[in-house]
C-alpha cells in the first residue's frame, strides 16, 4: 500500500523593531505540532532591505524546525528498540 501524506508549514513574520525580524514556523501533522523560531537583525551599517531580514529569519526558523523533526524521528526510532 502506498503511503501518501501532506504536511504543511505555516510561516509567520513579525517586525519586532526597525532592525529585527522574527519568523515562526509551525507544522502540524496528525500526530504532533512543532513550532520553531528564527531571528534576523540588521547591522546598522547596512541598508534596510526587508526581504533579506525575512529570508534570514525564515531560513533560521526552518533549520530549527528541521532539527526538531530529526530529533523526533530519533526518539521514535529509539522507542522501537
Task: Say what each PLM segment does.
Residues 61-81:
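C-terminal structural segments of small proteins and small subunits
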Residues 5-9, 52-53, 75:
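Aromatic-residue detector
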Residues 20-50:
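A short, structured beta-strand/loop element
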Residues 48-67:
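Short, well-ordered alpha-helical segments
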Residues 17-19, 46, 54, 76:
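Acidic-enriched, low-complexity/disordered segments with a strong bias for Aspartate over Glutamate
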Residues 1-30:
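N-terminal segment of the canonical double-stranded RNA-binding domain
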